[in-house]
């Protein structure tokens, strides 16, 4: 078992993203990075534009869904790809969860960015968020 980073596994016509972190915030950051590694080589994305997000969800799963879907919306509407992610905090009370996060990236430039696959949407398929032995594991499927 690893505790940090992300990985992809084959999952029919979709991509299963599995992300890890020592904190829930780090696992969400790695989940976002995992999604954008499906799209391009994130190490080549310059942090030219910052996007801030303050998002609420009814539970952790809904929060993860809305967080990733928010990033995908910027890609769809403005052509942005992201390579750096910072989740400042995730809080849950009995009624809802919230996240405060930032992502840095730039417009996709085919002369500098590798075109891999278009991520169409976030899904709830195979979604799991759990903590085990001091390591958070976040798993979900994106539609490509």
From Swiss-Prot:
Pfam families (alphabetical): Archease
Gene Ontology molecular-function annotations: calcium ion binding
Annotated Ca(2+) binding sites: 14, 143-144
Example GO biological process: tRNA splicing, via endonucleolytic cleavage and ligation
Residue stretches spanning the membrane: none
Gene3D superfamilies: Archease domain (3.55.10.10)
Keyword field: Calcium, Metal-binding, tRNA processing
Family annotation (NCBIfam families): PRK00407.1
HAMAP family: Archease_arch
Family note: Belongs to the archease family.
General function of this protein: Activates the tRNA-splicing ligase complex by facilitating the enzymatic turnover of catalytic subunit RtcB. Acts by promoting the guanylylation of RtcB, a key intermediate step in tRNA ligation. Can also alter the NTP specificity of RtcB such that ATP, dGTP or ITP is used efficiently.
Database matches in PANTHER family: ARCHEASE, PROTEIN ARCHEASE
Protein name: Protein archease
Species in which this protein is naturally found: Aeropyrum pernix (strain ATCC 700893 / DSM 11879 / JCM 9820 / NBRC 100138 / K1)
């Amino acid at each position: 078992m690893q505790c940090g980073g992300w990985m992809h596994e084959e999952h029919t016509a979709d991509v299963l993203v599995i992300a890890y972190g020592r904190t829930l915030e780090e696992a969400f950051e790695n989940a976002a990075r995992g999604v954008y590694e499906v799209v391009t080589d994130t190490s080549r994305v310059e942090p030219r534009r910052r996007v801030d997000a303050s998002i609420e969800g009814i539970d952790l799963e809904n929060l993860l869904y809305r967080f990733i879907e928010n990033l995908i919306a910027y890609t769809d509407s403005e052509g942005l790809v992201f390579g750096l992610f910072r989740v400042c905090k995730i809080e849950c009370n009995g009624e809802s969860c919230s996240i405060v996060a930032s992502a840095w990236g730039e417009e996709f430039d085919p002369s500098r960015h590798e075109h891999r696959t278009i991520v169409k949407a976030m899904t709830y398929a195979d979604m799991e968020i759990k903590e085990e032995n001091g390591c958070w594991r976040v798993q979900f499927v994106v539609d490509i």
